[in-house]
Amino acid sequence: MVVETTRPIELVNHFALFDNASKQCEMFETVVAGEPNRHVQRLLSNATQIRGRSGQSGGKKPRRFSPPTRPEIVELLEDKSMLPAIVFIFSRAQCEDAVHSCMNAGMVLTSLEEEIQIREIVERHCENLTADDKDALEYHHFIDDVASGISCHHAGMIPMFKEAVEECFAQG
C-alpha cells in the first residue's frame, strides 16, 4: 500500500454568493474553525427577512443572494489570484455546460505565451488521433477551450484529453 499525504496543490473549499444588492460576487470559506461558516448562515437567514422597497411585507420578497453564474465565479477567482482552480460539478453534462458558458462569455484566462504552450501540450498528447478522430471528438473545440484556460475533466473524456488537461493544470 502506498499512501501520499502531501498534495501538490492545496484543496480549499469556498462558498460563493452573488449579492443582488451590490451586484458583486462574494466568496466565503465553507468551514471556519471546523464548523460551517456561521457568517454565511446569518447572511442567508437575514436575506429572507428583507422586505420590498416599500418596506411592507406581502407578496414575493426580493432575494438578496443568488447563485453566481459560472463566468462570475471564474472572474472572482481570477480577481483573487486563485487560478488555476478546480470547480467540482457532479454531472458530466453540467461540466460541459460550464465550459460552454465561460467560452460564450468570451473568457480568456491565458496569455499568448501560455496559449502556445497549452496548444503544444494538447497536440503532443493527441498526436496519434487521425483527422476523422479529431472531427468525431470535436478536438478543435477542445483545444480552443483549453488554450483559453478553460476545460472540463470528467470520466467521459478520452484519456488523451484528460492527461493533457492534467498536465496543463499541474504547470499552472
Regions found by a protein language model. Give the residues of each.
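Conserved C-terminal RecA-like helicase domain
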Residues: 92-172
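Conserved interdomain linker/interface between the two RecA-like ATPase lobes of SF2 helicase motors
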Residues: 1-103, 151
